[in-house]
């Protein structure tokens, strides 16, 4: 069942926030754009936590760079088709916390304009992407710890398999939302309603 909870547009609430939606371009695990519109939306409860995280990052001379937030269920089906591994992608029949508007994917940019090295790229579905992995160089691990501190300081929690993913505590208790914008349909992708 899908809810119609109204989501908040991050570009409107935080006009200075850097938003680089990876699923609105080909720089993701599918190798193609999934979103027809580059809209970055979150549940109002996640907006409150994000505002705190933005302030904490600024205190450190850092900037958040948003890669994904709310994700239509149709997009989740396409990601599952590209990577049907429940360690990294939630099966659309289960329901991703992104599709509830309660999860966000992001990284950090320093005061010189450089994206911090996290030791593995966004959507790199490999053990190196796990929050704490021995193959990650110490400097990159410190950057992950910094991102984690900023996000948990705002009220989010991380997950063990992706350094870039944070969500509200109890995120799964929020309802799955009706798709808020369109996706490009891949052959073989099941329609989700």
From Swiss-Prot:
A single Gene Ontology CC term: cytoplasm
What is the UniProt remark on how the cofactor binds and its stoichiometry? Binds 1 zinc ion per subunit.
What Pfam families has UniProt attached to this entry? Peptidase_M15 (PF01427)
Site Transition state stabilizer — annotated at 71
Gene3D superfamilies, per database record: 3.30.1380.10
Q: What's the stated role of this polypeptide?
A: Catalyzes hydrolysis of the D-alanyl-D-alanine dipeptide. May have a role in cell-wall turnover.
Q: Could you identify this protein by its name?
A: D-alanyl-D-alanine dipeptidase
Source organism per UniProt: Escherichia coli (strain K12)
